[in-house]
Amino acid sequence: MVFADFLEKIKSLFAKTKDPITSMSPPQENRSPKAEYLNNFFNTNPTNGKSRGSQEAPRKPLGQTNLNVQGSMPAKKEGFNRVLDGLKKRQLQHDFKLERAAETYEPTQNIGSGAFGIVCEAVETSSNQKVAIKKVAHASATPTLARRTLREIRVLRYINHPNIVPLRDIFRTKGPLGIDVFLVMDLMQNNLHHIIYGNEDPLEEHYINAFLGQLLRGLEYLHAACIAHRDLKPSNLLVNQDGTLRIADFGMAKCADNSSKKHDDEEHCYYMTQHVATLPYRAPELLFVLPEHSTAVDMWAVGCIFGEMVIRNEILPGRSVQGQIKMLLTMLGQPPQEVINEVRCDRTRKLIQDFGRKADAEWDDIMFCKARGDDQIVRGNCDTIDFVKQLFQYDAQKRINIQDALLHPYIQRVIPAEAPQKKCPFRVKKDMMQVEDLNHQELISMMKQDVRSAENPITYSELHSGDSTGSTSDMSTNTSGEYSPIAQHEQLLEDVATQISICEPTCDL
């Protein structure tokens, strides 16, 4: 039995549902309980509203608004809807001014937004295929935004993994505050956050196992190249109706190699720590502003996501940094002294020390879901409890890494082993490390170069040259034109991965 069997089971069940985004029909009486459960699974109009401690409410069905028009006046209601539709269309046109790229992509509706970007659904005119376009506005306005944008571009452009969202195209336009960058990716029907809270019942165990397995496989691919995502959460895990999960939103991704420390001060300032990882999924080293961040921050987030799927609630639903720290101390007790000694902020250190040593809570109680009744996933299961404990270690060095997680008895039991997967090209790590040593102007020049250089197919001479990006002086020239597409060359990527994996170094974090 292979891991693909889990996906086949999900696909066969999800095939009974309607379009998870546009379907708003009420459940039919003759529908089987399993089909009804799956229909609610992708229902974008959950009845339970916003979950306790959740910072993101499930989105409403497309076209539905918060405006409630009372009375029997359908004409007025239709008039309101026409006005609202017009405002939405104008906002979409304002947000996604694609200029020359409008000949290739036609935006149809806004579907999401985050701290540093907005996303719309669009149609590729040549193939009539639906895609998602992420806009990073003012990408060149500050060194931090420019560096983040370059990181995301450089992570995604050579990635080729079924559990990581693929980059189909990229282009840029001139915005009011510099360069606006647009990333074109496959459109996914939903995300894990909506799946968890889109139904009154908690997820069944085989769904949890399948989603957890795909998440770990995607992280194995990234962590092999020392790439830390740093913003894992259910809303950044996209899910198709066939059950395929893909990791998305690499705006916070960073090379976690210990040799890259030049911009530690920038990455660890108060402003940055408010945006690296959403609060309920933020690892202790981020909360405590410790000197180093490694791929271990992703493993902490895996524990939070796993727990959220089990209990249908956030494990640590903090509302502020201080509240999150207190909640963490209540659950896990006081950190080891060696961790406290590494805390830079005096106020944070005092808060930890003043909290005192209290007995940490039992995982049987933390991961208990009343709605599951006697069918608990964690309670009484020694392997599961041990797996969770190893994910929630204060000390990042003692926290379980991705390789050991895949070999853990719990994972081995619930997720059948797969054949060794293709390794992440070492070029991804190399390109990410180059970004860290550039000033603002060099970042802008490299951003233009990265987008424009992708107009032409990548040759082997460029791949194996000492500096494929060119010198800074070369990058600052020939910058006319606003639209620069990237073509996907899947066979070339496979050949490159095969060539590079022969001499690829290992990274133990």
UniProtKB/Swiss-Prot annotation:
InterPro entries: Kinase-like_dom_sf (IPR011009), MAP_kinase (IPR050117), Prot_kinase_dom (IPR000719), Protein_kinase_ATP_BS (IPR017441), Ser/Thr_kinase_AS (IPR008271)
Alphabetical list of PROSITE patterns matching this protein: PROTEIN_KINASE_ATP, PROTEIN_KINASE_DOM, PROTEIN_KINASE_ST
SUPFAM superfamilies: Protein kinase-like (PK-like)
Coiled coil: none
GO molecular function, one term: ATP binding
Keywords, sorted A to Z: ATP-binding, Kinase, Nucleotide-binding, Serine/threonine-protein kinase, Transferase
Residues at the catalytic site: 231
Record has Nucleotide-binding as a keyword: yes
Cofactor(s) of this protein: Mg(2+)
GO biological process: cell population proliferation; dauer larval development; determination of adult lifespan; intracellular signal transduction; nematode larval development; organelle localization; parturition; positive regulation of cell growth
Annotated EC: 2.7.11.24
GO CC terms of this entry: cytoplasm; nucleus
Record note on disruption phenotype: RNAi-mediated knockdown results in an approximately 50 percent reduction in number of offspring.
Tissues showing expression: Expressed in intestine with a stronger expression in the four most anterior cells, muscles, excretory cell, pharynx and, to a lesser extent, in hypodermis.
Annotated Polar residues bias: 20-30, 40-54
Annotated catalysed reactions: L-seryl-[protein] + ATP = O-phospho-L-seryl-[protein] + ADP + H(+); L-threonyl-[protein] + ATP = O-phospho-L-threonyl-[protein] + ADP + H(+)
Domain of life of the organism encoding this protein: Eukaryota
Chain residue ranges for the region called Disordered: 19-72, 460-482
A Pfam short name: Pkinase
Family listed: Belongs to the protein kinase superfamily. CMGC Ser/Thr protein kinase family. MAP kinase subfamily.
Function recorded in the entry: Serine/threonine-protein kinase involved in the postembryonic regulation of body size, mainly through control of cell growth. In particular, controls the volume of intestine, muscles and hypodermis. In addition, regulates growth, intestinal granule distribution, lifespan and number of offspring.
Protein name, UniProt field: Mitogen-activated protein kinase sma-5
Source lineage: Eukaryota, Metazoa, Ecdysozoa, Nematoda, Chromadorea
